[in-house]
Amino acid sequence: MIIASNNKGKLKEIKEIFNDIELKSLKEANINIEVDEDQDTFYGNALKKAKAIYELSKEETISDDSGICIDKLNDWPGVFTHRFLGEDKTDRERNLAIIEKCKDLKDRSARVVCNIVYYDGEKTVVGEGVIKGKITEEPRGENGFGFDEIFELKNGKTLAELNSEEKNEVSARYLALIDLKNKLN
């Protein structure tokens, strides 16, 4: 099965959950393609990627899309979390821009939403995970990637302040993977 990603952090998380299946990254499958994530839902982006990779490989594919939805900003940045500043920006630059956008908000409540799609050319199965928390006032933590350093859980820690085992128990991707795995079994 192919994971429609080369993101090392994402691959590690997925391989830890689906540890009983042989999984390949795009690089390991010798696939070099960028799929334009232009859909207006996480599900739409994940499905588009999964179908594109399947068409090239004819192998079962799992693909995900995720992002932060800030309640008081009408769920911004949502599906644009990784792209709202442009593809050439770092995680830190994006995170600082999100913090800046939230600076005047009294309520910084947010959700991380993750949709993971399995596609085999005929069957489409989606797993969804959602976690609630808030946007921090500054980045915190060294573990993780993406927006992990600015998303604070109800326990007061950011996702980046958790070790990988702790994060795997609470992350939206973990919840989506478990949901997907249960639906596939």
Regions found by a protein language model. Give the residues of each.
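Anionic-ligand binding patches
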Residues: 1-2, 9-185
